Amino acid sequence: MSSSALQIAKTATYLPDLVEVQRASFKWFLEKGLIEELKSFSPITDYTGKLELHFVGEEYRLKRPRHDVEEAKRRDATFASQMYVTCRLINKETGEIKEQEVFIGELPLMTERGTFIINGAERVIVNQIVRSPGVYFKDEMDKNGRRTYNASVIPNRGAWLKFETDKNNLLYVRVDKTRKINAHVLMRAMGLSDNDVVDKLRHPEFYKQSIDSANDEGINSEDQALLELYKKLRPGEPPSVSGGQQLLHSRFFDPKRYDLGRVGRYKINKKLRLTVPNEVRTLTHEDVLSTIDYLINLELDIGGASLDDIDHLGNRRVRSVGELLQNQVRVGLNRLERIIKERMTVGETDSLTPAQLVNPKPLVAAIKEFFGSSQLSQFMDQTNPLAELTHKRRISALGPGGLTRERAGFAVRDIHPSHYGRLCPIETPEGPNAGLINSLATHARVNEYGFIETPFWEVEKGRVMKEGNPVYLSADLEDECRVAPGDVATDKSGNILADLIPVRYRQDFEKVPPHQVDYVQLSPVQVISVATSLIPFLEHDDANRALMGSNMQRQAVPLLRPERPLVGTGLESQVARDSGMVPITKVNGIVSYVDANEIVVKDVDGNEHVHFLQKYQRSNQDTCLNQRPIVKNGDQVISGQVLADGSACEGGEIALGQNVLIAYMPWEGYNYEDAILVSERMVTDDLYTSVHIEKYEIEARQTKLGPEEITREIPNISEESLNNLDEMGIIRTGAFVESGDILVGKVTPKGESDQPPEEKLLRAIFGEKARDVRDNSLRVPKTEKGRVLDVRIYTREQGDELPPGANMVVRVYVAQRRKIQVGDKMAGRHGNKGIISRILPREDMPYLPDGTPVDIVLNPLGVPSRMNVGQVFELLMGWAASNLNCRVKVVPFDEMYGAEKSHQTVQAFLEEASKQDGKDWVYNPKDPGKLLLKDGRTGEPFDQPVAVGYSHFLKLVHLVDDKIHARSTGPYSLVTQQPLGGKAQQGGQRLGEMEVWALEAYGAAYTLQELLTVKSDDMQGRNEALNAIVKGKPIPRPGTPESFKVLMRELQSLGLDIGVYTDEGKEVDLMQDVNPKRNTPSRPTYESLGTSEYAED
């Protein structure tokens, strides 16, 4: 055990800061990205060239945010800072310079945890992985089966340039997928002579055919080439030489229109072995000529030229927050530039000031649009700390400038050898997004160019150099090295022991002697993501199930009393710390004060550092965020130490579930098909009880008939129902509420038309005006109950920002404790999930030889076909650990300590546990890992010994309370008039095509008819049916479904003369829908059957 714990400690020290990818990127944006953009737009000149506006980018300044993070969340505000930049307006005619600091917009700021607060909600900007700008060479098969090659020059922004060859060995070029143009026409248009081109090529004879072809077409000069280019790129417009020059310049040589970016320039220089300076971001003649030369070498199959794999991580780069935000700022500044130019032209030149020219709105709008509605700005998943951390490390191929789900093929989604140590091969969603959304591997980092790097130890002459710092390599560099896996066995001084080592070299595997190894992987965990690295014995699980295990850990609900796993991997504390859920001290010192709300640390100099704790806050997913101190008064603390536990944390480690005693055996069919049988102890001891906080909100608005009022005086409500309301009509904090109870009383003025006829009659007789208001109170929804935790009232008088038309907003937070119940979903860490089918009294559960009843009974058939044997290792290791009263840390991939190491370790632990006093029954060498259980109901032993042990089991966020739903009558869809779907819409259950086939197969014609008509979209029929049921009359005959009428109308709108006709050929007017026979039942009703029976008596 010590070696496992020790090794992981050694690995864990190198785990980098897990949210660094977000923070570093935003820091870059503030320090460089924003200044770059402001500089690139400076100067802005008007159309006459008389005025110039310069942004002095280096001198931009951010004001202190108006609200801090907590206040922004409370007020539904954005945690943002105002940006000011110094502007100089220069009048070229008079030489006058006006300088002014101008407000250019609000910039949302990143919190310490790597998130943004937008309108009070915490959001995360997901990293995007896109194709890197650069030059790419591909081969394609034409329709005759001949292989052709093509080269694409892809800029960061601007027109794509694609070179291709045809069967006659002619070179063509396409600009942005337009028509093909002879490549030499482009060369001539760029001002290159035939000799310029030929001299640069290593094999000019191939290219000479293209020159001849151009001459044959009569394009001999630069002017003719420019005309030809203009004709092809702008067909239908009169061509001109100047137009051609301008077009060519703006497409490829204008830095504002065409930008390869730093990355694009770096990649092109690297691929084509050029020495163009990094500052040159547009195309050069050299780039184009070298691309053609490389393409010819491919065609002639000359060594040194290689094709590119677009799925290789060397050709894909990550765009993080900083860059995405920079692109958005560019969009805003583009709009601003147009406005400034217009204002320069319109305004009085002498009296203009920079502040009058610069309008902050376009930039504010662009930034707001990005944070509010971009596909990459997502509502943070706050179910538990792991979900939060994983969300910040997510890498998506979707979003603007990326792929779409429909277009993405298998190749993009597949695992690529270059993902090794960079993207996790396991953690990705199931379903349409599989492989498009990935997670960063544990040790990976993103370099300045946006390529993902991963660390290795250097190997010199067969010795692993662990003394220095690890070397970070990008996918391109790693391909050229021989890299050994992290679990190679070494002696104490780091010499590799085996004679032949498996290595990866150029995306292939080979075996080499130790002195040929260049690098060794840093740790066995570096291949996988954070969530996956929390699965113990991962190497014994099938990848599909490990994927489910990784994803389900993110859905674990924080429990009331969390418990650390008995069997962990050693990364639990790092995950808790980096998720930002636990407060950490930044100084060495002594704890001078502790209570439930704050912890004060006094440092060496006597300064006090106060840490406020979160108490029962609602998370984005309605789970409960609460922090509990774990230090005592007078404790000594060191910098970086955890002071309190957050939700789903215990002792500074992440604790997503509970360690429970599990037996693998069938029990009366209650665990058929992955169902789970649990003991009542889970309910009574609150093992799986969680707190959920719901937010209810109501606005008092200004209506046409007068203002709505929040009041205690609600018409037709008993005094009893108002017991818990205060004098304003708002529920008091601490009150217990059930579904249907009033939270906030509100009345709305009622117009004349709203009054029922009987009220009009009373008014006519008595002449007095009853109070004409309607009850519109906020009530607790069906299936919800709980205790009022907090009430917040927002009014304009207090200075709160309210939505337009609202006079007052009241928010009520209701907390509920949810115990585990039948229908809840539970899961282990190995993808073994199931639904609770029954909760048994503990006296009926199977029990151990010492009388302990088990907590959960799982089906043994869930293991063999799913091949997630890791759960069995965890079970037995947990069993040994609980008997030895210790916790175990197991490194995934432990073969470096010897073959079959997991097996040996577990066995050794079990033997150790059985040596304790009175514990000899714990391990039976004849039936290792199994015990003979007895039936709690009869006391008889079961036929076979059963695998029993402790496993870490989670309760997932898919709770039955949130899913269970019923409808009698409810809302209908507007067009089809069919009931809506889903719980939120109070919808019905869908009767789909296949269900109709089932009823047809049974010949249940009447059942089918009423399901398709009166129970669905026969509008008149359903009203009559309801009326008939209420009055106890026979149910009338169904009419025409509304969706049939919609179908008819749709066919008619296509110009088809289509109608419904009777046998006699008379057209039926569906829109009229009055059926004279409607009231005579088309089948015997229950009532008519009953009466006829009595008549016979």
Swiss-Prot record:
EC number(s) given by UniProt: 2.7.7.6
Record has Zinc-finger as a keyword: no
Keyword Transcription in annotation: yes
Gene3D superfamilies, per the entry: 2.40.50.100, 2.40.50.150, 3.90.1100.10, DNA-directed RNA polymerase, beta subunit, external 1 domain, DNA-directed RNA polymerase, subunit 2, domain 6, RNA polymerase alpha subunit dimerisation domain, RNA polymerase Rpb2, domain 2
Domain of life: Bacteria
Catalytic activity annotation: RNA(n) + a ribonucleoside 5'-triphosphate = RNA(n+1) + diphosphate
GO biological process, one term: DNA-templated transcription
Molecular function GO terms recorded: DNA binding; DNA-directed RNA polymerase activity; ribonucleoside binding
Region listing for Disordered, in residue ranges: 1071-1097
Keywords: DNA-directed RNA polymerase, Nucleotidyltransferase, Transcription, Transferase
This protein's GO CC annotations: DNA-directed RNA polymerase complex
Biased composition (Polar residues): 1077-1091
Family: Belongs to the RNA polymerase beta chain family.
HAMAP family to which the protein is assigned, alphabetical: RNApol_bact_RpoB
Function: DNA-dependent RNA polymerase catalyzes the transcription of DNA into RNA using the four ribonucleoside triphosphates as substrates.
Quaternary structure and interacting proteins, as annotated: In cyanobacteria the RNAP catalytic core is composed of 2 alpha, 1 beta, 1 beta', 1 gamma and 1 omega subunit. When a sigma factor is associated with the core the holoenzyme is formed, which can initiate transcription.
Protein known as: DNA-directed RNA polymerase subunit beta
